[in-house]
UniProtKB/Swiss-Prot annotation:
Residue ranges with Basic and acidic residues bias: 1-11
Primary localization class, coarse: membrane
Residue ranges annotated as Extracellular topological domain: 162-176, 227-230, 285-296, 385-402, 454-457, 511-535
Entry protein name: Carboxylic acid transporter protein homolog
Modified-residue entries (N-acetylserine), positions: 2
GO biological process terms, semicolon-separated: plasma membrane lactate transport; plasma membrane pyruvate transport; plasma membrane selenite transport
Length: 616
């Protein structure tokens, strides 16, 4: 085992005197201490705590507030993020056990496991104290991400509110125009994979800018598409951008924020989707006052926000957290090379990556299958209840443009409130019970929202319906992250979400086709001229609420599972310590490389990068 250049705290019988740094190693040679730019050895003194965890000494090179914030975050990851100290270290329950006894025990505990109400604490539920800790830079990055997701939703719902003029322009039935909505959802998975890999590996900034540039192109070109085929091609670009923007926008918005504030900020961030719908319907109505083709101006006007965001993002560097991640990766790689006897690590080829992915799927196939099925329901909920709402209000109920605008705005305000309130409410109920409550309430409001067919009923019941739909989404992201296994969280959680989204891509097209089976009026030739969209939306939305309820009930949860990566946390702490001492990470890596070039007597067996990570 190679020695470590990084600072080591000595526990047990060995004690380190204050003001001294003790280097030790387990190999056959000693490594030199780290030095600063002038060649002077660094005398780094770590923080020391007594058994009661009272701080006896802190590094004077770090500001007091910074030290306290770091300590708070570490305690939060270990204590606040654990419910009564429950940890899931081995994750044995992620591996399927299909014995009869295991299945029986699991089935009998589906109801009783819901009865545990977690301890109520205003400190856990009230986000205001933590929001006050947000700096202006934190808010700057948050709104940069928030408005990027809003612009994506705005671009998507521009088609939803313009179905009627688009159908007239291309002389196509409504179901063909709604296929443009479905196409966006179909190709979102491709965008998520392409830009997700780029975002995780290299940058948050440039994928963000690229996706926004694609939105500008798509929104600018859509009104100029003179054929239906060109229209679909342009919406295909929108789908790629929409799939890619979510990951980099959410990371930009959340990852630098205080840890305790992230739950509330996550719910607020997702509400940008509903706000995008509000922007689309308001400006559609506003431009419709002046011109019959006001929908074209809506598309062109919507590009101002992504253009503004592109210039805004160009002015700011990568987030602080991601900058530390990039530096930590350099340290991880240098330590892995050192552990490999100084030899460069071989890169895994495509076949080896596929074999690794196959092993992961074989290990977690049951959990993965459950998560895919679970995600189908909420994705259908969103699109089945929202995408055709303006069409139903205009074409079936014959409401005025002003009434349609008011209803869409009010119901989406309900969606915004639901996401934030349920996001905090689940801290008391837990994930599953919170989801079941949202599904039950939503099912109760489905019939009056769609079937009473009056403006007042839609305003009241519709507000509560979308309150519950987005209440589901206020809980689901963290529930999904907690269920996914630690060693395959990105693969299992990300792929299951995208497959669930893919399954729901045709929701609006299915609704328009089913509406033809429930005609309200026919012309002299027997052709349907007025469809019952409300009945179809009520049937599909109610069915999906029941489906989602069943999936959540038979599932399980890992409330407040620790989502942090111990390896990355360790190396990020090293980055912070080195930079606090005025060291360059590049210099640290160079020194590690020089030390790794020294031949060790016991270096006959080389380590892989994965084995090094396991050792850490």
């Amino acid at each position: 085992m190679s020695s470590s250049i990084t600072d080591e705290k000595i526990s047990g019988e060995q004690q380190q005197p204050a003001g001294r740094k003790l280097y030790y190693n387990t190999s056959t040679f000693a490594e030199p201490p780290l030095v600063d730019g002038e060649g002077n050895p660094i005398n780094y003194e770590p923080e020391v705590y007594n058994p009661d965890h009272e701080k006896l000494y802190h590094n004077p090179s770090l500001p007091a507030q910074s030290i306290q914030d770091t300590r708070d975050d570490e305690l939060l990851e270990r204590v606040y993020s654990q419910d009564q100290g429950v940890e899931y270290e081995e994750d044995e329950e992620d591996k399927p056990n299909l014995s009869a006894a295991s299945i029986k025990s699991y089935a009998l505990t589906r109801f009783t496991s819901l009865l545990h109400i977690h301890e109520f604490s205003w400190e856990n539920v009230n986000p205001i104290p933590e929001l006050r800790k947000m700096t202006w830079q934190n808010w700057n990055y948050f709104f940069m991400g928030y408005f990027a997701w809003l612009s994506a939703a705005w671009a998507f719902f521009c088609v939803s509110v313009s179905v009627a003029p688009l159908a007239e322009l291309y002389d196509r039935p409504t179901k063909d125009i709604t296929w443009g909505l479905g196409l966006v959802l179909f190709v979102r998975s491709a965008g998520a994979v392409i830009f997700g890999l780029w975002t995780d590996k290299s940058s948050r900034k440039w994928p963000y800018i690229t996706c926004l540039f694609l939105f500008v192109i798509a929104q600018l070109c859509t009104p100029w598409c003179d054929t239906y085929e060109k229209f679909l091609g342009v919406r295909w670009i929108t789908g790629i951008a929409m799939g890619g923007i979510y990951g980099c926008a959410s990371a930009t918005a959340i990852e630098d924020a205080p840890v305790k504030a992230r739950s509330f900020l996550s719910g607020l961030f997702f509400s940008a989707y509903a706000m995008g719908f509000i922007f689309a319907i308001i400006f559609y109505r506003a431009f419709g006052y002046f011109r019959d083709d006001g929908w074209k101006i809506l598309f062109w006007f919507s590009i101002f926000l992504p253009i503004l965001l592109i210039f805004w993002r160009l002015l700011w560097p990568e987030t602080k957290y991601f900058t530390k991640v990039l530096k930590a990766r350099k340290l991880i790689l240098s330590d892995a090379v050192k552990a490999n006897g100084g030899e460069p690590l071989p890169k895994a080829n495509f076949k080896q990556k596929m074999v690794s992915m196959k092993r992961t799927v074989q290990k977690y196939w049951l959990l993965f299958a459950y998560l895919v099925v679970l995600l189908v329901g909420p994705n259908y909920l969103t699109h089945a209840s929202q995408d055709l709402l303006p069409t139903m209000l205009r074409a079936q109920l014959g409401l005025s443009k002003d009434a349609v605008t008011v209803i869409v705005v009010v119901t989406n305000i309900g969606a915004i409130c639901g996401g934030m309130i349920f996001g905090q409410f689940m801290e008391v109920t837990g994930r599953r019970l919170g989801l079941l409550i949202a599904c039950t309430m939503g099912g109760c409001f489905t019939y009056p929202a769609f079937m009473l067919r009056s403006e007042k009923a839609i305003l009241g019941a519709g507000f509560m319906l979308y309150f519950c739909v987005f209440g589901v989404w206020g809980i689901l992201p963290i529930h999904l992250a907690e269920l996914a296994p630690a060693d395959a969280r990105a693969l299992v959680a990300g792929l299951s979400y995208q497959l669930g989204n893919l399954a729901s891509a045709a929701a609006s097209t299915i609704e328009t086709q089913l509406a033809d089976r429930y005609p309200l009026e026919r012309d002299a030739s027997g052709a349907v001229i007025k469809e019952d969209y409300a009945k179809v939306m009520a049937i599909l939305t109610g069915s999906v609420f029941i489906f989602t309820f069943a999936c959540v009930f038979v599932g399980h949860e890992k409330f407040h599972r620790d989502l942090s990566s111990p390896v990355m946390k360790k190396y990020i702490n090293q980055v912070e310590e080195y930079e606090a001492d005025g060291l360059s990470i590049s210099d640290i890596v160079e020194q590690k490389t020089e030390c790794a070039s020294v031949k060790m007597i016991d270096s006959n067996v080389s380590k892989t990068y994965e084995e090094h990570i396991e050792t850490v």
